[in-house]
Amino acid sequence: MSRFEDIFNGLKRAHGCTYINDTPKNGEKLKGKSFIKREPVTSQLYENHLNGIEATLGIIPITDDNTCIWGCIDIDSYDGFDHQKLLAKINLLKLPLVVCRSKSGGAHIFLFSKIFIQAKLMRDKLIEIRAILGFGNDEIFPKQIELKSEEDTGNFLNLPYFQGNKTTRY
């Protein structure tokens, strides 16, 4: 559990929650309610996420000192996204990325760092990678390069592996 927390470390004072309403039909986006909770991120939240206890956990990658240890390109695709083709391209280019299926059926392309780096550096690198992979318009997390105040939370990304072994996000 602690390894999962370390890998998906982020803002400690707030997190995202998503409640899924129903099972989508082919080619449709999962419908649900997402919001930010301004309360501490705990080990129990990570455990609940992996055990499939709703709501899904969303982590805000940018921290209070405007650094992050991971970032993500969020490819929204609701029907027939070819994960194998994406993985083949990443492998061919020898990019240090991890791909997980997102709840929409698209992909979350993660870039991890061994140490916390400036959010701007992470965003800049992901923008470059996004262009190389041909996904120039897809979202990047962290979305911000700095939090403007103690009240600012940034944007969250739903983590992979909701429901652990039964997940569709792998």
Kindly label every feature range from the protein language model:
Residues 1-70, 80-88, 155-156, 161-166:
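DNA replication initiation on ssDNA origins
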Residues 99-108:
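Short, conserved phosphate-binding/catalytic loop or strand-edge motifs used
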Residues 56-83, 92, 113-170:
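DNA replication initiation modules
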Residues 89-100:
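Active-site palm subdomain of RNA-directed nucleic acid polymerases
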Residues 95, 105, 155:
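Residue-level signal for beta-strand positions within conserved beta-sheet cores that form or flank
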Residues 14, 107-112:
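Broad hydrophobic/π-residue packing in well-ordered secondary structure
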